[in-house]
Design a protein with these regions (language model features):
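Long, well-ordered mid-to-C-terminal structural blocks that present hydrophobic/aromatic surfaces
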Residues: 271-354
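Metal-cofactor-binding active-site regions of metalloenzymes
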Residues: 2-295, 347-353
Length: 354
């Protein structure tokens, strides 16, 4: 596609002074990317997936775009429904001009320019031309999943993985001499804390028991099972844990009463709700944090979001479909207490807080 004389994306995009230009072009531009948090598919990277069209790359699973499209009033049919891939792309093209001043606008045009050589702004008038141009390039050998990462000099790519995952795609990538990217898992165990949702939690405990070979019947056996999965992930190159919580739990002391209630909760298959989920989460999370410290891992905490606000979409589409929101929780005292509990015992791992 033709290059416009006044490109929105150019070599000095966002560089607003000669100093900024020098710092970026001389020092930063050629540095490798070490991506320690993403939601990329390890299967796509391990198999070097080729995509049939740009909608499969851009729109399938990208709930940030889905959220923007819903905000603009696009019908769900053209977001997650049965519309064709081209129809969904054109719905996105219709939305993009209205994302101005949102990072989606910048990301969209950076990706079009850097990955596909497209200088045009994406809108309903240019949408079909952009769609066809991207698809022609995607049919070639230089626009596979790995080639995208290699183009941006990604040398270390972490994915987000549940403790019950078998990590076979990370192993596949490691054993593939043609894969130039270090593909590693991260340990994301939100489901292990969701004791407030008894039915889902108990199903997850069954899965964790099966994959760890430990029958989970009390707190000790739960922590043993989690330790085995930490060890397994570590043996597969993991050095990062990740947690999504509305708030960190209140500090409390582990007691035999907590263990007894957890035993009863498991044996009764959640017939009664757990009386103090915060106490349970605190004890499990503190125990895990000590495991991370022992292994030299980094722990990440995503705090403050209200997840899955729309129960209708949660039921029909599942979790993480673009209906989260910012919460109004209090964090400072809980965060201070949690970190201090670990630091007092010299077991505080390196920590990243979002």
């Amino acid at each position: 596609m033709s290059v416009q004389s006044h490109s929105f994306i150019n070599d000095h995009f966002l560089l607003l002074s000669p100093v900024a230009e020098r710092l970026y072009h001389t020092y930063a531009a050629h540095q490798p990317i070490i991506d320690f948090h993403s939601h990329l598919s390890p299967a796509d990277i391990a198999t070097n997936k080729r995509f049939d069209n740009i909608s499969q790359v851009w729109l399938a699973g990208d709930h940030y775009k889905w959220r923007a499209m819903r905000t603009y009033g696009i019908p769900e049919k053209y977001i997650t429904g049965d519309a064709s891939d081209q129809e969904k792309f054109m719905a996105w093209a219709k939305t993009v001009p209205h994302t101005l001043r949102n990072p989606l606008f910048h990301w969209t045009h950076l990706e079009l320019k850097n990955s596909f050589g497209i200088d045009q702004l994406l809108n309903p008038d240019s949408g079909n031309q952009v769609y066809d141009h991207c698809n022609r390039l995607l049919a070639g050998e230089e626009h596979t999943s790995r080639k995208f990462l290699e183009k941006y000099n990604v040398v270390y790519q972490a994915t987000t993985d549940d403790p019950t995952d078998d990590l076979r795609f990370h192993q596949m990538a490691k054993n593939d001499p043609s894969c130039k990217i270090q593909l590693v898992p991260s340990f994301r165990l939100d489901k292990a804390f969701a004791i407030h949702d008894a039915a889902s939690f108990l199903v997850y405990m069954d899965s964790l028991s099966a994959v760890s070979g430990i029958q989970i019947k009390d707190m000790d056996s739960l922590l043993t099972a989690l330790q085995k999965r930490v060890d397994y992930f570590h043996s597969n190159g993991c050095s990062i844990a990740d947690h999504g919580l509305q708030q960190l739990p209140l500090a409390n002391t582990f007691t035999s009463k907590l263990d007894a209630e957890f035993k009863n909760f498991l044996s009764a298959r959640g017939a009664q709700s757990f009386s103090d989920p915060d106490a349970f989460v605190f004890h499990v999370l503190i125990s895990l944090a000590k495991m991370y410290h022992q292994r030299g891992w980094v722990q990440q905490f995503h705090l403050g979001a209200i997840r899955n606000n729309n129960s209708r979409l949660l039921k029909t589409l599942g979790a993480d479909v673009g209906v989260d929101s910012i919460g109004d929780f209090s964090h400072a005292s809980r965060l201070s207490s949690f970190l201090n509990t670990l630091d007092a015992e010299d077991t505080l791992a390196k920590t990243i807080i979002y």
